[in-house]
Swiss-Prot record:
GO function term, MF aspect, one: thioredoxin peroxidase activity
Residues of the transit peptide: 1-13
Protein's recorded name: Peroxiredoxin PRX1, mitochondrial
Membrane spanning residue stretches: none
């Protein structure tokens, strides 16, 4: 898949770009879990990840040891997020916020996992600052040491300028967030520039919305918050809506509000 891959084991593996889209996830998974010693990235080889794409699997070194991403997630939801660098101000506030809010993610059956291109040793030292700032005993989730940029490449966690430097060791990841459901489908993608910190309340809000819409077959309007009214999809007839939801408020034939259960 890459223009050059320096690994004896990979030379024994068939590497061809799939001609059919449904084969892509299988190829990505093989790439992600194979041992890679060095490589030359090409932008044309990069996986195209979209909402409802299979989340690529991978093996990685983390602050809790080696993990397989799918095994770590199990049958939970997942939030994979990257930060540009350890011991930097915005990243410190972000990871501290995720650590402090871990109980809220636990309530929603969501597992967190962070990432940057520093090694695990750097992460472990930085975690001491995180614990102090967040006032927590433990961060509560692993942070990947993506020193070879494998996961950053898989999940396109770089900006246009950074991609030019992906092979020279100077790349830093942007602030990416991937929400992944128990079927290992990517359900939501956020990408923030390095200068702008994320909003953890928004991450929780969209998880609430995704889980609610999956469960009840509704959709959520702009600025929706838990306990707000939801929208009945246009594909549901009025008779079906009455049977399923009871009372609803019809603004237009295509815009009908109801209470969530």
């Amino acid at each position: 898949m890459f223009s050059r891959i320096c690994s004896a084991q990979l030379k024994r593996t068939a590497w061809t770009l799939p001609k059919q889209a449904h084969l892509q996830s299988q190829t990505i998974k093989t790439f992600a879990t194979a041992p890679i010693l060095c490589k030359q990235f090409k932008q044309s080889d990069q996986p195209r990840l979209r909402i409802n794409s299979d989340a690529p699997n991978f093996d990685a070194d983390t602050t809790v040891g080696k993990i397989n991403f799918y095994d770590y997630l199990g049958d939970s939801w997942g939030v994979l997020f990257s930060h540009p660098a350890d011991f930097t101000p915005v990243c410190t506030t972000e990871v501290s916020a995720f650590a402090k809010l871990k109980p809220e993610f636990d309530k929603r059956n969501v597992k967190l996992i962070g990432l940057s291109v520093e090694d695990v040793e750097s992460h472990e030292k930085w975690i001491q600052d995180i614990k102090e700032i967040a006032k927590v005993k433990n961060v509560g989730f692993p942070i990947i040491g993506d020193t070879f940029r494998n996961v950053a490449f898989l999940y396109d966690m770089v900006d246009a300028e950074g991609f030019k430097n992906i092979n020279d060791g100077s790349l830093k990841t942007v602030r990416s967030v991937f929400v992944i459901d128990p079927k290992k489908k990517i359900r939501l993608i956020f990408t923030y520039p390095s200068t702008v910190g994320r909003n953890t309340s928004e991450v929780l809000r969209v998880i609430d919305a995704l889980q609610l819409t999956d469960k009840e077959g509704v959709v959520t309007p702009i600025n929706w918050q838990p306990a707000d009214d939801v929208i009945i999809p246009p594909s549901v007839s009025n008779d079906e809506a009455k049977a399923k939801f009871g009372q609803f408020n019809e603004i237009k034939p295509y815009l009908r509000f109801t209470k969530s259960k």
